[in-house]
Amino acid sequence: MLCLLPVLLLGVGGSPGRAAPVPELLVDIIVSHNLALRQESLEDESYRGEEGILRLRPEIGRELGLEVSMGDVYLRAVSLHEDAEKALERARRVMADRSEPSQPGESARNIVEAFLAHKKMTLEANALLRDYTRSLTPEADERLDREVCRDLMVRLLDDSLRRTHGRLRDALGCFVNTCQGVRSEPCITPENVRFVNTVFGEFVNRAPEGLLEPYDLDRLDPSRASNLPPGWKRAVGSGAARIAGLVEDALGKLDRDGSIQVDPLLFLALIRRESRFDARAISHVGAAGLTQIMPATAEEMGMENVYHPDYFEQAFSLLREERKARREAVAALFSITPENGLQKAARARELMQESLRLRREKKRLFARYRRELREQPSDPRLQPDKAVEYGLAYFSGLLRDQKGDISLALASYNAGPHRVRQYSGIPPYGETVRFRNRVLEFYREYLAKLDNT
């Protein structure tokens, strides 16, 4: 009954590239990882009907041409989970509502009512899903047929590798998106990046060197920086010509220092994403200049006259307090029972309101910093040559620390090296994932233009 639909043949962009046969090792790693994830989902009650070595929900299995069991029990569970999420969202809206209730205690009562409804429907839905998974057999549901699904996995991986021209991280993102019924471009998302990190990392660590050769592992090509054709600056366009010259000068200093070389087109792609080549760009949290350097990072690198008033650190302290209050508000919400409901609900709303107050104060301080920084021309981050020189040196160091892995160096630049270590790969933050995707998109655009010159 295996019949792949046209979705498997659609490219993400451009014509599909050739790819090597899918290695058995990669398939084995995904199978092991998916089976472990399924077991975890049953234990922590995040299971939503995903079955087999592909972890397909029945709707997706059917789309991919498999015979699946769905039935009323599963459909009822899905409906209950949807209603439970709506009830939870109602509770959260009341927690965040700044308006005064018309009657004392009204907000707490509404929170209790919505959350207990959420809890009741979630418990009922999870019980139905346990019944559902116990009822499945390989004879009635091809998601449980290892041979059929292993063949399908190879086909999906092969298609993903062709669509991404052998870029392994992106191919893994496309693969898991297809298995989850997600249509996403770029392929790597905050939702799937943990899967990508785990499978990519294990495959690269376990595979013999020859098995890795056909794949693009996001590695820096050390020869590119020193072997660019004379007209390479034309690839970035006339609007960035001056910035390209500054990058070229900064690369010369790196070469004299013995630092790891950086493809100037990669770094220009980073600048384009960070500041759109605007030398006076300032982010909402105070990163400044072409390369969007934070005050503390600038000082650590030895930049002088960095505008770094005391209240700037106060803004970050407020940010931490805001997040802490929000976490505590959610914890209070999820501790609600029929017995303690009103007390916990009132506390949850109080904490959420405090989080929102801290957020407003934080935004006020950051706005003040942006205004004042624009009046500080001596800040070297706003001087194009200094921003490029120090930003390039910093990025070069990150590339060295990440052993030439461009994706991890970009993630480190955006979220900090400690976050890359924490998640053993690209952190699952929306901003960081989008940053990595966009820089590499610009980089590939420049390389394509270079090939056409």
Regions flagged by a language model, labelled:
Residues A20-T453:
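Catalytic glycan-binding domains that act on GlcNAc-containing polysaccharides
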Residues L2-G11:
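Bacterial N-terminal signal peptides
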Residues G11, G17-P21:
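Boundary at the C-terminal end of the N-terminal hydrophobic targeting segment
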